[in-house]
């Protein structure tokens, strides 16, 4: 029997690559033919399963400190894992986070670097974020966004949550108090109005726009396509 092992990570325990390797070894030991196909849904591990990093650049972390963020570019295609620039782990977890101040600016810097380096297709995995800024930080780093015309910006989402709901659903996991959740909810609601007024995109109606604290919705407002992270990775690695 031939088995394709397509496992995602066990968060906090083992990476997708480690898990698939262990399962393949066990199957081979049992006399089966097994092939490893590590998977990701757009969250942590997205970069690793799509070839791994071949560049590292210094960008702005979620709370303003500089961080070294790995990413990948090959043949005009860039792969960015937002957690590498704006992730909760970068600030030491929810207890050390400032959920109101946390910004996606560094993720925007990575996207900008990718395009400046020749990428015409940019895959952004969103998940594991420290942020609930609705993507406004990233958009500030990308300004002026007109220079990204002709670039395919694709956001791999790991949730279906809509934009304004991101605060209520995920902000408590990032250290937000009930009062801060209410503040962040109101901020996202206002941002949705601003995005519609400025770009004509109704981000609140887009499934998955609440991913990474609304980063997905912010990027959608400038033309990004939001897709299922699992389906994107499956397509990219030829899992069929």
Annotate the PLM regions.
Residues 1-240:
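N-terminal loops that bind phosphate or other acidic moieties
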């Amino acid at each position: 029997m031939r088995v394709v092992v397509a496992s995602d990570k066990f968060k906090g325990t083992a990476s997708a690559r480690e898990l698939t390797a262990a399962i393949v070894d066990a199957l081979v030991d049992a006399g089966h033919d097994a092939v490893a196909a590590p998977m990701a849904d757009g969250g942590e591990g997205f970069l690793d399963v799509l070839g791994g990093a071949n560049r590292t650049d210094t960008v702005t972390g979620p709370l303003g400190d500089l961080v070294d963020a790995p990413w990948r570019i090959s043949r005009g295609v860039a792969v960015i894992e937002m957690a590498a620039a704006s992730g909760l782990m970068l600030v030491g977890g929810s207890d050390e986070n400032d959920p109101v101040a946390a910004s996606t600016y560094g993720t925007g810097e990575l996207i900008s670097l990718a395009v400046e380096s020749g990428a015409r297709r940019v895959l952004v995995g969103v998940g594991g974020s420290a942020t609930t800024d609705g993507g406004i930080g990233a958009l500030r780093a990308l300004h002026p966004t007109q220079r990204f015309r002709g670039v395919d910006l694709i956001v791999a989402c790991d949730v279906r949550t809509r934009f304004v709901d991101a605060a209520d659903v995920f902000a408590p996991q990032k250290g937000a108090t009930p009062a801060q959740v209410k503040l962040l909810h109101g901020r996202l609601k206002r941002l949705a109005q601003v995005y519609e007024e400025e770009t004509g995109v109704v981000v609140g109606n887009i499934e998955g726009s609440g991913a990474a604290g609304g980063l997905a919705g912010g990027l959608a407002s400038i033309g990004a396509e939001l897709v299922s992270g699992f389906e994107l990775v499956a397509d990219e690695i030829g899992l069929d």
